[in-house]
Amino acid sequence: MAADKPADQGAEKHEGTGQSSGITDQEKELSTNAFQAFTSGNYDACLQHLACLQDINKDDYKIILNTAVAEFFKSNQTTTDNLRQTLNQLKNQVHSAVEEMDGLDDVENSMLYYNQAVILYHLRQYTEAISVGEKLYQFIEPFEEKFAQAVCFLLVDLYILTYQAEKALHLLAVLEKMISQGNNNKNGKNETGNNNNKDGSNHKAESGALIEAAKSKIHQYKVRAYIQMKSLKACKREIKSVMNTAGNSAPSLFLKSNFEYLRGNYRKAVKLLNSSNIAEHPGFMKTGECLRCMFWNNLGCIHFAMSKHNLGIFYFKKALQENDNVCAQLSAGSTDPGKKFSGRPMCTLLTNKRYELLYNCGIQLLHIGRPLAAFECLIEAVQVYHANPRLWLRLAECCIAANKGTSEQETKGLPSKKGIVQSIVGQGYHRKIVLASQSIQNTVYNDGQSSAIPVASMEFAAICLRNALLLLPEEQQDPKQENGAKNSNQLGGNTESSESSETCSSKSHDGDKFIPAPPSSPLRKQELENLKCSILACSAYVALALGDNLMALNHADKLLQQPKLSGSLKFLGHLYAAEALISLDRISDAITHLNPENVTDVSLGISSNEQDQGSDKGENEAMESSGKRAPQCYPSSVNSARTVMLFNLGSAYCLRSEYDKARKCLHQAASMIHPKEVPPEAILLAVYLELQNGNTQLALQIIKRNQLLPAVKTHSEVRKKPVFQPVHPIQPIQMPAFTTVQRK
């Protein structure tokens, strides 16, 4: 659409000049000749006719406008800066602003406004372009049919780019009606006229081809809108129309691949992408779209959804390389540094997708477990998309992951003595055991540089999380806000599946209430609530790591007050609040948070869309497994989460010298999990309790065996039934730190 918009606008301008009222026959002839020369591509002749018109009528700004457009097309649409400057001068000359458009006089200036909207569109100033386009749409009735369609198509494209799919569908319905009525009117005229003329039949065939092309374009826009709305049943119907009208062209196959991707048919989506003939595409110099870049990016997204993250990052890097090659070719044509938009076709101003690809790479690298590489990608992307709270959260997660041990390192330490015994010194009677320190809190991460410098530190993570909270709308920061129970799809708190995974269902009644979050999908009401919970949980963790216990307690309390809180984040909220309270010497309050009965659910709150996505499938058509797994740092069950609470509760009782209660908590927790799953912190707690009880030999045996003694286990098993009996066998999990649950 971007490539043919300027052509439409130029043709309309010249025709409008030729039909102006109160002109002489000479002016009318010059105007007609200029228009015909323009439509045939003879821009030199067109400019000559316009120069003659300018000599006759020097006060008509429309002639200057048409001259600027003709010169723009003569340069192969490479003088965008000159056209933009001329449009601004003409706008100041007619003393009109978009907000003041309210009369027929402004309708006469519609070409000027439309041209300005097209320029804004290519400069990615979509909000301003929509403002101009919507003003034009108010006066669409007096416009000629072709120009009215151009305005509508421009607005549809802008609505889809800004994720306003409902508005786009409304305009597409208007366009369908407009094309249908125009076709009927033409058929009526042809019936009354003489159709034996060869030129008339050619014109009729050409007109029919244009109508079919417009209908095909409408079907493609409908598919894009339905994909954004996740309305897959309606999308399936439109996909058939697209394939019937556009055939196996690259755009139609890409749309169908996107549709199959949303349905979960990832292999079919890959097959459709591979079947597209990219070589037949006109190229980015004519369309502004780098199809190879889109191809690799789409493959990366599909493999990300399949949890094949290493393959995904491979394809994203290929897309980045392709994008950089294209940008290098485009920058080679620019000679004047003062005119950054000139020297290349205007449509190529939309070609560069570097920052969108960097965003994708960052999310992919974060899932792979390479937080530093992910940080480098996202910190570059945030310079462009600095108003995206989700992006700031991802940056903070990179900092958190970079400043804690990896999952493999943490898991390797559990079955060995490395997590308990640091070294052994001395010999014989003087032989001593040096226990490993488990304290990782209050670490000074800053090495003297400003925390505002973008490095993957915990101080910078705190800044990122503060930015994310400030970017959330104020109405979402009220925990007493109405829950909005009509939303049917609840999404996860702290995991991002893909760029489209967090898009709300079209069934939501709050579909038009969202905040933009480019380059990913916009944040709807329910997603904002989930996002805020994730930000608060991360903020509490970072504050604890930095030793800011009051701030950590504040964030944890706010997290627990949220009306829609997943079980896993509620579990984290209680643990973070308890740790902050213990550091503040408010142990009694901490014990309240560490009550195992507080844990009734450890779900991530992710509600898959499989039912909605699979509802339009055939009976024998199965949904592919995405292979997604819940993060291993979360307890796998309520039982294991309560075990963590009991271990921490035992620590709290030790601080109050209530050793009997601490021992009871330890034994109760140990009876609920496999001996190999007991974390080193729990073994150290048992050693501490035995030393306090004067049982030095028993403490040494615990250290030697690296597990709780069988006698201790037997004592708890004597009871007929544990307090928290596991319903099913507990799978091995990665236990968190003793009073800190680390999270990805």
From Swiss-Prot:
The keyword Cytoplasm applies. GO terms for cellular component: CCR4-NOT complex; cytosol; membrane; nucleus. SMART domains: TPR. SUPFAM superfamilies: TPR-like. Residues 183-199, 496-506 have a biased composition (Low complexity). Keywords: Acetylation, Coiled coil, Cytoplasm, Nucleus, RNA-mediated gene silencing, Transcription, Transcription regulation, Translation regulation. GO terms for biological process: mRNA catabolic process; negative regulation of translation; nuclear-transcribed mRNA poly(A) tail shortening; regulatory ncRNA-mediated gene silencing. Component of the CCR4-NOT complex which is one of the major cellular mRNA deadenylases and is linked to various cellular processes including bulk mRNA degradation, miRNA-mediated repression, translational repression during translational initiation and general transcription regulation. Additional complex functions may be a consequence of its influence on mRNA expression. Is not required for association of CNOT7 to the CCR4-NOT complex. This is CCR4-NOT transcription complex subunit 10. It comes from Homo sapiens (Human).
